[in-house]
């Protein structure tokens, strides 16, 4: 059985149709079944990524259902010692927008309009493996995130000893 903390990898270009449907990469669907014995997953707003100044990139994060249930349990049990204001913000921005999903037989999933709007998903998008989750970005946003990451990479690699 694969390591449940390191199952999603790679970058996969895709598109979204006029009805808001996209195909989850086959590798990701297979990983859900192999590692979690469950095809269900949860889609929510990703943590915004700073692009410098007051600009932020918005995307979506997708978690296996069992991993999401653990995240939600820990957040609501306040294991992080959050203030009530922080916990309310986490609920509004991360927990409450979450939607349980299941791909159809063709691997398609409907991204809810509110999440599509949040992430600016219109046509071209990227699925990006992030070990225990995967993210969904519009092509333009992902290009900006990559540009920012390239600028930060030398310092980030040095910080972890490379």
From Swiss-Prot:
Keyword Lyase: no
Disulfide bonds: none
A Pfam cross-reference name: MraZ
Chain ranges of the SpoVT-AbrB domain: 11-62, 98-141
One example of a Gene Ontology biological process annotation: negative regulation of DNA-templated transcription initiation
Gene Ontology molecular function: DNA-binding transcription factor activity; transcription cis-regulatory region binding
Keyword Plastid: no
InterPro entries per record: MraZ (IPR003444), MraZ_C (IPR035644), MraZ_dom (IPR020603), MraZ_N (IPR035642), MraZ_sf (IPR038619), SpoVT-AbrB_dom (IPR007159), SpoVT-AbrB_sf (IPR037914)
Keyword tags: Cytoplasm, DNA-binding, Repeat, Transcription, Transcription regulation
Transmembrane domains' residue ranges: none
One of the record's GO cellular component terms: cytoplasm
Subcellular location: Cytoplasm, Nucleoid
Signal peptide interval: none
HAMAP family: MraZ
Family as reported in the entry's similarity comment: Belongs to the MraZ family.
Alphabetical list of NCBIfam families matching this protein: PRK00326.3-4 (NF001482)
Subunit structure, interactors included: Forms oligomers.
Protein name listed in UniProt: Transcriptional regulator MraZ
Primary gene name: mraZ
């Amino acid at each position: 059985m694969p390591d449940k903390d390191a199952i999603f990898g790679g970058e996969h270009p895709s598109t979204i149709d006029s009805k808001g449907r996209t195909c989850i990469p086959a590798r990701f669907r297979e990983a859900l079944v192999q590692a979690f014995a469950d095809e269900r997953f949860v889609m929510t707003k990703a943590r915004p990524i700073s692009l410098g100044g007051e600009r932020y990139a918005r995307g979506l994060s997708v978690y296996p259902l069992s991993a999401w249930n653990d995240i939600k349990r820990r957040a609501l049990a306040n294991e992080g010692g959050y203030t009530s204001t922080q916990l309310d913000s986490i609920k509004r921005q991360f927990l409450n927008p979450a939607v349980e999903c299941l791909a159809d037989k063709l691997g398609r999933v409907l991204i809810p309009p509110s999440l599509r709007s949040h992430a600016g998903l219109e046509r071209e998008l990227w699925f990006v493996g992030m070990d225990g989750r995967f993210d969904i970005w519009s092509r333009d946003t992902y290009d900006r995130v990559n540009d920012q990451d390239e600028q930060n990479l030398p310092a980030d690699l040095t910080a972890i000893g490379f």
